[in-house]
């Protein structure tokens, strides 16, 4: 249905990935040109991370949008709506960046709302029936920020101002139950940066206690065996978590140490076994080319993955590999010398870049990193037969497959049938 834009006074556009910048700003410009009465406000992590660059970007405020909200936006957006309705000056809207008389103004930031003041998400105005899914898979967050928050490459907590807080686990179970009944689905994606073991333990027990029928996936950080025990994963699986995503990054202890992952290879191996034995599908994220990483250290990661693959112990079921990317506002970006980064290359034609090329003093050159990456890609083609299935599905679609067929049946499918991409 076509919207009557005359009924609206404000449009908010979230841009959370660099690939959304062009379509997001194109939409903003078209709306602004066609409906000049609208106030266009931008949110999301991309412009949050570029807030310091907006002082000399008056053209963006003139041609594309009127304001930007940084950090968490619930309270600032409410304040912005109220100010626009009453015609008040925007100077007291927290977290707002806007232009006044050719000058870009950064308003004072407000403290984020406590979790008990955040409302349950609603999806009422989304055409869920038009998604190419037999059932909707709804996103849900039981926490904001990262409880660890130390990984030297990571910027995921930046939009939360490195402030971690979580929902009461009883309320999590109640809200999942409510959303499941309201939208007639049992499928969810927990979008937390990482669910802590203690929170996972209490959450699973509350979901089981309340009898909520749920199927979901979640993100975890590797922790010691007493924190991520067999008993924890048994409860997690019984509560409905069929798939867990772990940030392995590396299986070399030196690299893990300078990344500040807070774990070692032995911990990674133990946790993956505990999770797999409970019936959970384990997916790993890893990368090659962290500054100072030598080829022998990258081979540790390859060897670990192969030894625990489908053709090995069977504790790793899928994997997503990449080449290390140096991101703006990471610990490495702010202290490159500590990580033997000789130079971060700032291209003047890419003044809103988030990822930067760099030169190193130690470690594999970029060409060798690419060679390792391509070698790993060929290795996992042989050691993960089920890659023919999961490599071509989004994680939400794959969650439905896991619930429909089960982990073992999917693995058997790949072994017993010829599945062409």
Spell out what each predicted region is.
Residues 1-108, 326:
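Glycine-rich beta-alpha loop elements in corrinoid/cobalamin-binding modules
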Residues 99-139:
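N-terminal [4Fe-4S]-dependent radical SAM core
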Residues 133-170:
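Canonical Radical SAM [4Fe-4S] cluster-binding loop centered on the CxxxCxxC motif
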């Amino acid at each position: 249905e076509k919207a009557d834009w005359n009924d609206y006074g404000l449009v908010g556009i979230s841009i959370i990935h660099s690939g959304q910048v062009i379509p997001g700003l194109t939409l903003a410009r078209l709306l602004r040109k066609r409906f000049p009465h609208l106030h266009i406000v931008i949110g999301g992590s991309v412009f949050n991370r570029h807030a310091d660059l907006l002082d000399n970007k008056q053209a963006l405020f003139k041609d594309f949008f009127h304001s930007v909200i940084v950090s968490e936006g619930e309270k600032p957006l409410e304040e912005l709506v109220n100010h626009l309705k009453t015609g008040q000056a925007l100077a007291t809207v927290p977290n707002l960046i806007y232009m006044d008389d050719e000058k870009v103004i950064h308003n004072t930031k407000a403290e984020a709302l406590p979790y008990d003041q955040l409302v349950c998400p609603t999806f009422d105005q989304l055409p869920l029936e038009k998604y190419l899914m037999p059932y909707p898979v709804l996103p849900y967050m039981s926490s904001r920020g990262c409880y660890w928050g130390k990984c030297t490459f990571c910027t995921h907590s930046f939009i939360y101002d490195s402030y971690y807080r979580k929902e009461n686990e009883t309320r999590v179970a109640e809200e999942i139950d409510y959303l499941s009944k309201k939208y007639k689905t049992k499928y969810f994606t927990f979008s937390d940066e990482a669910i802590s073991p203690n929170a996972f333990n209490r959450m699973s027990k509350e979901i089981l206690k309340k009898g909520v029928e749920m199927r979901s996936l979640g993100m975890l950080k590797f922790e010691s065996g007493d924190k991520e025990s067999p008993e924890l994963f048994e409860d997690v699986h019984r509560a409905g978590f069929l798939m867990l995503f772990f940030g392995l990054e590396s299986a070399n202890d030196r690299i893990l140490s300078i990344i500040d992952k807070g774990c070692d290879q032995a911990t990674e191996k133990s946790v993956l076994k505990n999770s797999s034995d409970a019936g959970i599908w384990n997916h790993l994220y890893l990368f090659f080319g962290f500054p100072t990483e030598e080829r022998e250290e990258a081979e540790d990661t390859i060897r670990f993955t192969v030894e625990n693959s489908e053709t090995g112990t069977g504790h790793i079921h899928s994997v997503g590999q990449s080449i290390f990317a140096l991101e703006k506002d990471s610990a490495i970006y702010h202290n490159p010398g500590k990580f033997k980064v000789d130079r971060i290359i700032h291209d003047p034609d890419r003044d809103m870049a988030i990822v930067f090329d760099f030169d190193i003093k130690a470690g594999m050159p970029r060409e060798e990193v690419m060679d390792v990456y391509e070698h790993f890609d060929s290795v996992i083609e042989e050691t993960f037969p089920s890659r023919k299935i999961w490599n071509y599905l989004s994680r939400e679609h794959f969650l439905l497959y896991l619930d429909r067929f089960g982990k073992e049946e999917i693995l058997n499918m790949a072994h017993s049938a010829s599945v062409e991409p």
